[in-house]
Design a protein with these regions (language model features):
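Conserved catalytic cores of very large enzyme subunits
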Residues: 114, 121-505
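Charged, amphipathic alpha-helical regulatory modules used
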Residues: 2-131
Length: 506
């Protein structure tokens, strides 16, 4: 054996010996043996990622691996951090090929982001369970964060936020993170559900529905109709993440049905007509009172799958269907009276109930002194003074601006007109999710220049539009069976279980 060969063999043996003694400290603190094969594999993968073929770069790759190995083994310390190894690899790759070096660096940063998100997720969930994550626990006043049922929903929400960040394009998330836009409800983004809606209660009550695989037929009294309405509301709330609205107009026919039922009851008694009419009116008023009370208690005591009461609004629009204006007025009066009276809390003190929100429409027959239903508006104003409810909506202004008067979905989201056979349709519709542009942020970024302001605004509006398109695309292929109460049993539509909901959305 020649002298040079002996020397090379000795050097290789020394290198192998040093390599076998070298230890790597991983990110979680665990210590494992140094393995050059892992580095070799990572570099090969980086070249394949960029050039789709590493064969022509084998010599370069070999040089990089040799130099990386040399630098690591020259370290006097027995232990070396994984981050330091990655720094060395990126430096050596960059010396040979900056494109691959950038790809390697980008991959490393992406892996770091994933690791950080996992660590953050664990920390957020742990904080929900031990009560230290006050941001998550107190984010929604309608959710009692200390309850186990609510905590399950909050934990799922934290996972959804992490997953959403991996699904939503980087530029959109960056705009959200810096406050230029707000992507609402990231804690529900991964689920195949939508935001808020106007429930088609008329269809569900008149034609029947299904709740928990049980057939619910058309009610035969107001009391039953009001109870079914609250059950529908709870089911809908468990199938979406936003608010919902029903209208008293859809319940008004059952006031008439109850009256007719009471009239039949008294018809068999030989009583003076005036006395009989008084008895009928009194019994009907009692049923309305009991029905509204049941409705209020049901809405405020039911708990949905996400650990909260249904975010429900009730539309009070006297002229929505002129045939039932009188019946809507009777229901509205009782809703206002009971809201004024308050609901006892756990201490037995009458307080303002949370739900439903009341949406009271001002029109020609209830706005002016002397108008037929002005007494209702005076009652509503008393209610507002004490209970900060109802919200007021102007029929005149809505018709001037939009052309039609209709309620908001839940609290504030409002639909644009949509026509079927030339007629506007609002009930049985909803929205897919919400994005908000931060106008003060836009103004600051544009440095108070009007031209720049609109350019910046267009940029962020475009991101919001893309986010809306993502929500739409995400629902493609989703079947009606994902939320039967919405898509199969009338709240939104009457599809078959295997029908695509996107066809209805289109």
């Amino acid at each position: 054996m020649k002298g040079n060969d002996i020397m090379n063999n000795e050097l290789m043996e020394n290198a192998r010996s040093r390599a076998s003694e070298k230890l790597v400290v991983k990110r979680d603190g665990k210590i494992c043996p140094y393995e050059l094969s892992r580095i070799r594999s990572a570099i090969y993968k980086a070249y394949v990622e960029v050039y789709h073929n590493e064969e022509q770069f084998k010599e370069k790759i070999g040089e990089i691996i040799t130099e990386v190995n040399r630098r690591i083994l020259e370290k006097e310390e027995q232990k070396i951090d994984i981050e330091e190894i990655q720094d060395i690899v990126i430096e050596e790759v960059n010396k040979v090929d900056k494109v691959v070096g950038k790809a390697f660096k980008d991959y490393r940063e992406e892996r770091n982001r994933i690791r950080e998100s996992k660590q953050k997720l664990y920390k957020e969930v742990e904080g929900i369970l031990d009560g230290t994550n006050l941001k998550a626990l107190n984010e929604n006043a309608n959710k009692k964060g200390y309850m186990s049922s609510t905590q399950r929903d909050l934990m799922a929400g934290e996972l959804s936020k992490v997953m959403a960040r991996r699904m939503i394009p980087k530029d959109i998330m960056e705009a959200h993170d810096k406050g230029a836009i707000k992507i609402h409800d990231l804690d529900y983004y991964v689920n195949n559900i939508f935001n808020c809606d106007l429930i088609n209660l008329e269809d569900m009550l008149q034609n029947g529905t299904v709740i928990n695989n049980k057939m619910i037929e058309k009610p035969k009294s107001l009391r039953t109709a009001m109870t079914i309405a609250t059950q529908i509301s709870a089911q809908v709330a468990s199938s979406q993440y936003g608010g919902q609205t029903i209208t008293l107009t859809h319940l008004a026919p059952f006031v008439r049905i109850s009256r007719e039922k009471i009239e039949r009851k008294f018809a068999k008694y030989p009583i003076n007509k005036d006395i009989k009419d008084k008895l009928i009116d009194d019994e009907l008023k009692l049923e309305i009172k009991d029905s509204v009370q049941t409705f209020n208690y049901q809405v405020n005591t039911l708990q949905t799958s996400n650990g909260q009461s249904p975010f429900l609004s009730v539309c009070i629009y006297l002229n929505e269907n002129p045939e039932y204006t009188k019946e809507v007025a009777m229901l509205a009066e009782e809703f206002f009276k009971q809201r004024l009276d308050g609901m006892k809390n756990k201490f037995g003190i009458k307080a303002t109930q949370t739900f439903p929100k009341l949406l009271y429409f001002l029109d020609e027959n209830n706005t002016y002194e002397g108008s037929e239903y002005f007494y209702l508006t005076k009652l509503a104003v008393q209610c507002t003074a004490l209970r900060m409810n109802p919200d007021y909506m102007s029929v005149k202004k809505m018709k001037q601006v939009i052309g039609y008067a209709f309620p908001t979905m839940g609290c504030r989201a409002i639909l644009s007109p949509w026509f079927i056979d030339g007629k506007p349709v609002f009930y049985g519709r909803g929205n897919l999710g919400v994005q908000t542009v931060n106008l003060p942020f836009v103004a600051l970024e544009s440095k108070r220049d009007e031209k720049d302001f609109f350019e910046v605004l267009d940029k962020y509006l475009n991101l919001c539009r893309r986010m809306g398109e993502l929500r739409y695309e995400k629902l493609k292929g989703v079947k009606a069976s994902v939320a039967p109460i919405l898509w199969q049993y009338g709240a939104i539509s009457r599809l078959n279980p295997n029908d695509d909901i996107i066809d209805e959305i289109d």
